[in-house]
C-alpha cells in the first residue's frame, strides 16, 4: 500500500463528481435507510449508521434529507435492498469493483455489464478481481490550517493504532485495519483532528497506470456506473495520470 495515494486519484475525478451532487444524496439516502433498518436509527449504537452519517455530513447532505431517510427505515412496508458486488476490468485492463444496493439483481447486473463493456471493459467472475483489493479504514486530514508536521501526524496516527499513512501537499491519508477503524478515528478526534473523509473502503494492493489514450473511456465508464441509481461505490486499481 505504501506509495499509493487514494486521495490523488479521488482528486483526479473530483470535478466530474461535483456535478453529481443530487445523485450522491440519493445514494446516501439509500445507504442511510439500509443502515438504520438493519441496526436501528441511533448512530451511537449503530456503527454502520454513524459511518454513513459522517459520509453524508462530509458531502454537505441537508439534515432534512438525512431525517427523511432515517424515518423511512421505520416503515415496515418500505423496500428492501440486496448488497451485491460486481467485478471486472475497465479499459486498459484496470481492475474494478462495483458495489450496489438493489431491489432487482437482474436489472442491476445488466446495467453494470452494459456500462463496463460499452467502454471497452469486461465483466469477471466472482473472486477474479476482489482478491486484488483489501478492506481498509480510510481517514483523510487536510493540511490546510493544520499546525502539525508530518512526523507528529505519523506519531499520532500510529499511536492511535493506524497501519499506514501517506502524505501529499494537500492531505494526510491514514489507513487502518477495518476492525480498528472506529478506535483510530475516535482517538484522533480526541486529539482535535478533523476529517475531510472517513470511511471503510476497498484499497488496491497495486495500482495500474491508466493509459493516456484510455483515460477518457475509463472516466466515461465510471460516470455511467455512478449514474446508475443502484450503484453505491466504484473502486478501481487505476492510477490516474497527472493533469
From Swiss-Prot:
The keyword Transcription applies. It is found in: Cytoplasm. SUPFAM superfamilies: YebC-like. Pfam families: TACO1_YebC_N (PF20772), Transcrip_reg (PF01709). It comes from the Bacteria. Its main location: cytoplasm. GO terms for cellular component: cytosol. Residues 1-23 are annotated as: Disordered. GO terms for molecular function: DNA binding. GO terms for biological process: regulation of DNA-templated transcription. The keyword Cell cycle does not apply. Keywords: Cytoplasm, DNA-binding, Transcription, Transcription regulation. Belongs to the TACO1 family. This is Probable transcriptional regulatory protein LSEI_1022. It comes from Lacticaseibacillus paracasei (strain ATCC 334 / BCRC 17002 / CCUG 31169 / CIP 107868 / KCTC 3260 / NRRL B-441) (Lactobacillus paracasei).
